[in-house]
């Protein structure tokens, strides 16, 4: 039961962290707006709430001496994944802080980056928050006011990571993975791989056929030239 709860919390944190990274990449782009800045704030706060819940659950379990060896190994694996999610969140929060300073919304002379991306991010934020539609309530100067809060929250995440290392010592290199790197992607990739593979095979076949024809033409031309030259040499002699 506890293991399933930890996995569910970790899955939620991973999803929200991924959504946050997606939105951070749009800061300063043509999709940037006041709504985006509010979505970023709510999403990162949601991620921090999930991080605290994950930390509390996993810390309690890993410090429990009655946990079996097999279960402890599984919880240590979850702990490593959780630590990685937290590191990624901190990196993206720092990136959001830098881009927020670099691209304030209410400075008309500051040109936005033409990233080629278009459309809003409300759908991504709604998935992260597990709501049907996002509600926007922030002030018009959220892009400036929120930067100080973001800086404080970055420090809080850093302190959390430090406390985690002090309370639970799980070196990442001691934890064995349950599957090969990228194995979780194979199931999704293989769905479309067969159709794509068939197309690529047909393309390769047609390309090979054309190559054979060209090679035959070139060989024939060289052979004809050689015969003509031989005849000319015989006549001249």
Swiss-Prot record:
Belongs to the RGS7BP/RGS9BP family. It is a single-pass type IV membrane protein. Residues 234-237 are extracellular. Expressed in a variety of neuronal tissues, particularly in sensory cells including inner ear hair cells, photoreceptors and dorsal root ganglion neurons. The chain crosses the membrane at residues 213-233. Its main location: membrane. Keywords: Coiled coil, Membrane, Signal transduction inhibitor, Transmembrane, Transmembrane helix. Residues 29-58, 135-169 form a coiled coil. Regulator of G protein-coupled receptor (GPCR) signaling. Probably acts by regulating the activity of some 'R7' family protein (RGS6, RGS7, RGS9 and/or RGS11). The gene is RGS9BP. This is Regulator of G-protein signaling 9-binding protein. GO terms for biological process: detection of light stimulus involved in visual perception; G protein-coupled receptor signaling pathway; negative regulation of signal transduction. GO terms for cellular component: membrane; neuron projection.
